[in-house]
């Protein structure tokens, strides 16, 4: 809530504390589909956090997450430029499927067809 409040209300002095708390949360849990999707974008030179704004947004929607709207509002507030995967989606989906660490911890099972659909959604999503 601290990081969300800082971003949505331009309380920049709270960003460091909010980021620290979020980082501690990641360190004590595991990441899921959003991270699994992000690496094929980051491997093409898109900054990891920028890629995550898109991949985590579609992952929240896919998982029917109660946090989807909150995350979407934060990502839109930050006005991330549109991203699009350059490599062939079928090959990218095969790479993502190998990343069992992130897919196995996801609350919903993920198929290759799901990944292809999610990448297509990311390629058409605009958060700016």
What are the residue ranges of the model-derived segments?
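Active-site segments that bind and position negatively charged phosphate/pyrophosphate groups
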Residues: 1-76
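C-terminal charged capping/lid subdomain of soluble metabolic enzymes
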Residues: 68-128
């Amino acid at each position: 809530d601290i990081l969300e409040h800082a971003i949505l209300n331009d309380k920049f002095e709270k960003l460091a504390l909010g980021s620290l708390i979020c980082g501690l949360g990641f360190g004590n849990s595991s990441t899921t589909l959003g991270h699994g999707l992000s690496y094929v974008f980051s491997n093409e030179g898109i900054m990891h956090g920028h890629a995550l704004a898109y991949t985590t947004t579609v992952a929240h929607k896919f998982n029917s997450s109660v946090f989807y709207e909150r995350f979407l509002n934060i990502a839109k507030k930050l006005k991330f430029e549109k991203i699009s995967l350059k490599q062939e989606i079928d090959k990218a989906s095969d790479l993502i499927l190998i990343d069992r660490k992130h897919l196995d911890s996801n609350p919903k099972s993920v198929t290759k067809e799901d990944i292809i659909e999610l990448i297509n959604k990311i390629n058409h999503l605009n958060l700016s």
